[in-house]
Amino acid sequence: MFSSITSKLSAISGGSSKNDYKEANYYNYFRILEKKQTEEIARKRCGLYSLKNHNNVFVLKEFSIETEINDCSSTSIWTQSYSNDSNTPVEAKYQLPLHPTSVVSNFQIEYQGKVIQGKIKEKEKALEKYNDAIASGGQAFMATKSDDGYFNLTLGNLPPKENVKVRVVISSELGTHTDGQLHYCLHRYMFPSYAFNFNYNVVLKFSIPIKSIDCDGFDVNVNYKENSSKKEAKITSKSQHTSGVKKNIILIIQPVELNEPKSMIEYIGGGDDKSYATAINFYPSFKNVNPDEVYQKSEFIFLIDCSGSMSGQSINKARRAMEIIIRSLNEQHKVNIYCFGSSFNKVFDKSRVYNDETLEIAGSFVEKISANLGGTELLPPMVDILSSPNDPEYPRQVFILTDGEISERDKLIDYVAKEANTTRIFTYGIGASVDQELVIGLSKACKGYYEMIKETTNMEKQVMKLLNVAFEPMLSNIKLDWSSCGLVDVIQAPSHIRPLFNQERMMIYSMIPSNQTNQDIINASIETSKPLIITLTGDGPKGNVLSFPITLDFKNDLSTNSNQIHTLAAFKHIQDLEESERKEKKDNKDKIVELGKKYGLVSKHTSYIVTADSDNVTEETMKTVDIMNQSPPIRPGGRIVSRGGGRSGASGALSSSILSRKRSSSPSTATKRSSSSSFSSSYLSLSSSSQKKKKEVSRSDDDDDDEKIENCVESYESDGGDQSSEQDEEEEDDCDDFHEDLDEDLGATAMDVDKKECEKECKKKDSSKVDLKVKPSKVPLPSRSPSVSKPTTTSLLSPSPKSAPSAPSQQKSVKSTGDLLIDLLKIQKSNGSWTKSSIDQLKIPTDKAPAELSTTELNDIWVTIIVIAKIVKFFSSEKAQYELAIQKSTRWVKLQLSKLNLPENTFDKFLSNAKSLV
């Protein structure tokens, strides 16, 4: 049963105790905050803060948080009261670290007995209005969200000695963790480090019963509402807290297990602006799926560090691990393998469907892996992978194995994080000198897992641990069908639903406009007491399509006293629109501004703005206090490097240092450098230009730096890694001749080289030019194979058709490696079977087949059972390495036996018999 693999996942993620929340995916945002700055600096950056002779001008006196939580989200009202000791007018900054799943949906400023409400404006207009108000001596407040995850509120011309009250409304998704837990996190970086009065109250209103409520870091009382079937509860502080907040506050909610999607519905009325919104959350259980029943589609991409530092035992172990990995995949998968260093190469131009031909080519590629690619440049292959559209039918899972460190690590992590909804990343850090933050950061950014391999002795076992996690049951290619109930013009967010991996929770929002068609359907549903049914479908763990009905009960489940679901639905839709601008270069500004104004949301194109005419126009010089500049900033390319290995989940403090990569600038080196290295060098050399200080609010240096990096990546993506010049065209004839000669030399080999790739190999670039393209190095060619026919296309690195047939049973002779387990796996077919002709060379007896399998056409079934028995019996201590390959074989044998209409226990009986014979 999958409970055993679930326990592996719990071990990797640190278990499911209340103190392991730091391993949850949602906590990665806070983990990065902790790495980038000290606690002292971070706590000075939160709230309203200024420096005047190193003394606080604003001091937080009172802080209350009132929160309402439902099945999937929370709405919190933060009220903070500050005293103001300034003797002059002041321009201050209010800052709050804001999680990517959170959004400020309202804010108010109260001072001089006035309550001033923030309004959403288009960002440029808000900035213009703010500057005009300041210039005329009036008060103004403007709020934006920065790229580094902070909600920034600029308060201009605050009168001296006037106390200030800030009220902020924050809507957020709940954090999710293993075992279906829901977390509401208040990180300590959200609070100043000094003492203040703190009041904390939470109301829970769930649609399903709550199993347990716990709170880490704060003493609370929990009271369930009477007659609510434990669906509603109130959480309050046990006592008055006057010492502030010293630790993270994590509210841990454990709902009862519900293996079906659950919906919540919200209605906003008034005038013509009526609408419905829904929130659907789903935490499926796959506990009843046996490992050998899992036959789900997925794309596996492996990146192997082949830099010089990997030479010796590390690269040998990596090669052996890859030998095992490629035999662990099955015919529901796509696969590709990259080797990277100063340049990179890959076995296929695009990931190929896994079959005998693919396996043979990949196997030949793996045999030639060596530590011969110079330095460690991970960005170019990652751009090559992530710039390709993902296939929803084949969830993309990337495995990175490295022993080094890279330049501009943080920028790479930020880049891959943008693909968290399309790609899951697993990372392995080898040895004591690996950049631990790179390994952890890449995996956490894309909701994967990591493994620190301190010693290479058991490297294969540790590598396979994460591959097992990637094989766990999941639901992919998820779609919501609204047409079955007749509703139209429904806006779903996110529009593309991320695969639902084991122990993950899905949350989907929608906005249903109250047009005549929809209103008629909903009214009829209410009048007849017949809920509407929509359908969620997805590809299940066994390779079949699963369908889940979702009930929308507009009569009994309708909420009309909040806009919490609307707010998050609009926020998620804005994120979709912003992503479309980034990837597809669409102009969605008008739609984003419209949604921002309607629901009060700060976005890429909107800001909060408040201006107020002062009773007494400020004539004194305004003092600007910018808490952003009270400490040396962390450089965008700064390094926080972790030394030493350790098991996954280690959370010890990591040493910080600023590191830079030394690069040769000699002409000879530049000439020899590959184009992928040129791309990386151009990328890494980017730095934000210094800006003149202005009173007006302006975009940060980080914005400029990110834009340059994005432009650099776009240069590669738009040209597909191939930027030709007139000089290149002059050499086309030579390249054609080279390609023809290569075709003749290879004959019917299993692997050609794309003509474009050959052209690239022929071209000689002027080393003085800046080249932004990424070109894979020439791929090592495997030996000829008579079992694979000559391809009919110009590129043998392009994907094979899905229907590509497996190679014939006759297999070539395989030279022994001296490692019997590897020898056996290397002659396994892609479907998991072995043939008599392949194992005869290993002198494994296959006679004494049971009567049911004694005919020649059934030989392969018995042969496969014999090999399974031999591996299980003689390599029991290496089970972690061969487990997936044997599961594939077991599945194939059981399928063949079922076709023969043999009893279900036949496999176990035959396997027991085979063990006695080997």
From Swiss-Prot:
Compositionally biased spans, kind Acidic residues: 716-746
SUPFAM superfamilies: vWA-like
Region: Disordered, residue numbers: 625-814
Superkingdom assignment: Eukaryota
InterPro entries to which the protein is assigned, alphabetical: VIT (IPR013694), VWF_A (IPR002035), vWFA_dom_sf (IPR036465)
Ranges of residues in domain VWFA: 299-467
VIT domain span: 44-172
Classification via SMART domains: VIT, VWA
Native species: Dictyostelium discoideum (Social amoeba)
Extent of Low complexity compositional bias: 650-690, 777-814
UniProt protein name: von Willebrand factor A domain-containing protein DDB_G0292016
Regions crossing the membrane: none
Biased composition (Basic and acidic residues): 752-774
